[in-house]
Amino acid sequence: MNIKSLLLGSAAALVAASGAQAADAIVAPEPEAVEYVRVCDAYGAGYFYIPGTETCLRVHGYVRYDVKGGDDVYSGTDRNGWDKSARFALRVSTGSETELGTLKTFTELRFNYAANNSGVDGKYGNETSSGTVMEFAYIQLGGLRVGIDESEFHTFTGYLGDVINDDVISAGSYRTGKISYTFTGGNGFSAVIALEQGGDNDGGYTGTTNYRIDGYMPDVVGGLKYAGGWGSIAGVVAYDSVIEEWAAKVRGDVNITDQFSVWLQGAYSSAATPDQNYGQWGGDWAVWGGLKYQATQKAAFNLQAAHDDWGKTAVTANVAYELVPGFTVTPEVSYTKFGGEWKNTVAEDNAWGGIVRFQRSF
């Protein structure tokens, strides 16, 4: 075999091997198109489509830090120092359209921490507490809502004023399990009917935290409302199935100008005791009122006053100032006069308290 034959044989072998490798080569697939997150503006700002679905999702919430001093205007006791508390609230909202109407969900988890001097004796005197609570978790289809929410006795009339210490004179329990249906007409009228489990707080009067039903019979709430450009008027009636008593509230709101609004609310309870789920003011009746003045784009002034049948009077004022978009600082001053039948339940007749709230909402 000469050199020429050897070179020709080697070349032939290389060509054969290359052909075999080419036959076995793996062809890489074409890269799939990337599906970017799409903005969903059907339900307000902050929503986006969950990839691969027509469901819109929003993640939002707030971080809050409160510093309190002076008296506790709910109980009339001296704090003996600063009370501090922090909260992180994580909210998740979803929405999509169906043949039966808009399908929504809302959940809120609250992570709380508090360091309080109130009622603590000792060299350092700080008592700390922390906890996590599922504050809201409900499903809504059209006007039907089921899950954990706040009572329609509060929400349908619009709560109270835009102050922090708004429920020194309590207007009822908040969180409850419920099944409700809200009808909204095109002419400003709306109506609600709700079957509720009962609440788990009473505004701090008795220390009782359980006003939930003890059998199959639910609490029942019904309400009517009319809203227009001038303001609104709403009324609700609630039946407490545990004590077999009822309570009612009527509220009116008036927009005097684009910057200035006032409101007034009156309530009556057949049970005449705060130790119940709905009528948690003292005695037969209570009245609340307030105003809001939007002084500038950044600053709003709020005032609220309340009085009940047993002789408690509560007044609160604050200024909510938006330092930068999403970050609001709110200094607030409150006063409570414990008169009449309330006088014997507290150590001091008069309580002055202050609070500064720092809140970042997102």
Swiss-Prot record:
One GO CC annotation: cell outer membrane
One GO term of the biological process aspect: monoatomic ion transport
InterPro entries: Porin_alphabac
Listed SUPFAM superfamilies: Porins
Major subcellular site: membrane
GO molecular function: porin activity
Topology class, membrane: Multi-pass membrane protein
Key words of the record: Cell outer membrane, Ion transport, Membrane, Porin, Signal, Transmembrane, Transmembrane beta strand, Transport
The protein's assembly and partners: Homotrimer.
Domain comment as written in the entry: Consists of 16-stranded beta-barrel sheets, with large surface-exposed loops, that form a transmembrane pore at the center of each barrel. The pore is partially ocluded by a peptide loop that folds into the pore lumen.
Function statement: Forms passive diffusion pores that allow small molecular weight hydrophilic materials across the outer membrane.
Similarity field: Belongs to the alphaproteobacteria porin family.
Protein name: Porin Omp2b
Originating organism: Brucella suis biovar 1 (strain 1330)
Taxonomic lineage: Bacteria, Pseudomonadati, Pseudomonadota, Alphaproteobacteria, Hyphomicrobiales
GN (gene name): omp2b
